[in-house]
Amino acid sequence: MFLEIILDSATYSFDRVITGKICFETNAATSPRSFQIQLRIKGYAVYHHGFLSSPSHKHPTTASASDSDEATEIFTHSQPLPIPAGPSSKSHAIDFKFKFPSKSASSLPCSKSNDSMVNICYMLKATISKRYAFLGSSQSAKAELIMVPPNLAGKPLSANSSFGSSAKTFQLPEFDSVTPSASLYKQPSFNSNPAPITTSSATHTSQFSTSSSSSVNSVHTPVMVPNPYFQYNSSMTAPSSSSSSVAPFVPRRQFSVSSASDPPQTPISMSPPIPPTPSQFSAFMYQNQQSYLSPQSHYENPLSISSRPSPCCPSTPSSAVTLSNGFDSQSNAYNNSGTGPPMLYKFPQRSYTAPNTSFNSQRRMSSITSLPTASFCPVKHGVSPPSLAGNQPSPLSSPLTNSNVSPSTICSPDNNVTFVNLAPGEKLTFKIEPNDLMDEEEVVENSNMYSIPGKTVATTVCHSSSSSGDFSALSCHRNLSFSESLPTAEDQVHNNHCAVSPSRRSSSNALYLATLPMGYERSNSVSYCSDSSLSSPLPDDNMLQDPHALNMAYAKEFDVLINEVLQSL
């Protein structure tokens, strides 16, 4: 029987001691001293594909003349292995040490520097014989060699090292080794910074099966066993050898110690401070309202925003205001990974810009995707107001009811409705006072109405994606502003391009929303025209007590809506 090792002669130091373990079994319990083990090392020059083993190595041949590799023995040495005494057993494991003779270590060839078709390999054979009797004919002794790869001391590869096949020269990293198998190991996920492996670790396991006979020096083909310590990956195969009894040379393989994958990056749990500008601050609040009001809304990437309450808006925007965990870890994943809607990760300070057309929601219409022209259907005055339920829990989730207004009613020919054509990117904003719309007796009929002293301003912005005036594609969103007196210039800082003031007036001060064509459907405090139903954000009790805070909250929210319309245009 024999054990085979292949030394990486390009980096191997021939004065290094080779250590290993020889394992075999017998039928009967026997003392280790009953056996004799002879270690023999042989060196071979292997010529690949088309080169004969001539001294010049420069004689190419045709495929029909030489289809396999040729191996020439260039070195041989043998030494007995001392076996210590031990208890009798059937299984034996004997440690061994082997070292090249000092005289030949300095003269041993490593590789042919000018010919990549020639490789040098060395094979260590262990011949086991019993002193008094041979192994039984039915016994197949097993021998296993576990040795440290001789090239793992961190020495760099020489520039003239050339291993491989088909005239390919491989420049391998520092910690590479010849593996005892050509195809039984999987290719490792190569670690760019592998830890150096000490020479005391056992890394290679080769197992051979040999049937015993009277000739103890017979050579048999080794059977390789995968090593559990490493994962090997190689697309190369060893050169076939059909004309030589020597086991074929196995090229070097890249490998790395298999290790656990890197832990996933933990998203940042704290968001940066809110930008000082009002538009950026309102964008932060709008983002939180999105996560509270519409947990089903999602991006197409997809990434669902978790539902959670949003913090209250302060009365004035300030750069010192921070959101404690204002964004969940999922939304932070966008900025960390650089994926998702472009507007959400382009700005490092989270200066929010309204999502572009990739933003999708179950409650949003597709009309926001393209807006070549805009058409606006004016408001019909004098219709009965919708009732506002006063017991709604959320100031941004209370729908308006009792709306019987239809598009045909508002935009009918007998109402003398005129259309305003808006250029792309142009906004139409008009403010309506509740006293201009209805008579007082029409408002008193609703007992659940909110009543606020002062003026109420309903601001509406509409746009359409239809160039033919189709009202089904009309999109509108509104915003309310409350003040103790008439609206001032400070309340109208949202770039109003045009103001429409109806002529009808009444003395009602009740909270009232203007009735708009096509109705509304609420989505994250943004109302879009989709049917004849109406929906609008309502104030809660705390904000009703502070009209200025309510006014600021809706003003900031309206600023986000304007930015969103501009982005969509």
UniProtKB/Swiss-Prot annotation:
GO terms for biological process: conjugation with cellular fusion; meiotic cell cycle. Residues 195-219, 255-274 are annotated as: Disordered. Keywords: Conjugation, Meiosis, Stress response. InterPro entries: Arrestin-like_C. It comes from the Eukaryota. Induction: By nitrogen starvation. Residues 198-219 have a biased composition (Low complexity). GO terms for cellular component: cell division site; cytoplasm; cytosol; mitotic spindle pole body; nucleus. Residues 264-274 have a biased composition (Pro residues). Belongs to the arrestin family. Has a role in promoting meiosis whereby it is involved in establishing the mating pheromone signaling pathway. It also has a role in suppressing meiosis until the conjugation process is complete. This is Protein ste7. The lineage of its organism: Eukaryota, Fungi, Dikarya, Ascomycota, Taphrinomycotina.
